[in-house]
Amino acid sequence: MRGVRREEVLDLVAYEKIREAFLARTIELKRPRRIAVGDRLTFIFENRDTVRFQIQEMLRAERTVKEDKILDEIAVYNELVPGRNELSATLMIEIPRMEQIRAELDRLIGIDEHVFLDVGDASVRASFDAKQFESDRISAVQYVRFPLGPELACRFCDPQLAARLRVEHPNYRHSTPLEGASRASLISDLVAE
């Protein structure tokens, strides 16, 4: 999937005029792409449209109008757009009680080795953004990719084959099937140009 192009990013005035409709459309787009695995992990699968929304919102929040800064934001956020034969997601580690955040995150150190996408009897381990990791600490927001490759991407597009997100961390073991509207939305990413 190609990234967001400069000509697709609106200036602040033009964006403000369509923002309400764009926000409503993005909320609907993200609904089937938000997948909980257990009670602590939520994957929000990204594509060009979700990333474009994030770019527009960041430019709006920071009141960015300088061309070089706009191009910088596009470049940074385009790293979230999945490449060919892959899926990408923002992984949110949800910890509702502030006083538990550090302890719960510490319990999940090493999670980058334990997240998988299964399709039929095949599996691919998630690739985490190395820039977000230290050996003794993780953050509550992670960026992950599932590099399926051509064969597994093709298999994922076959709704007859079961697919699921699976976490096998010693302190957190859960899985969630990928089906219905969620699966269809991710399939559309894999076939997009």
Q: Which ranges hold each PLM region?
A:
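Long, contiguous binding/interaction regions
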Residues: M1-E86, T90, E94-E193
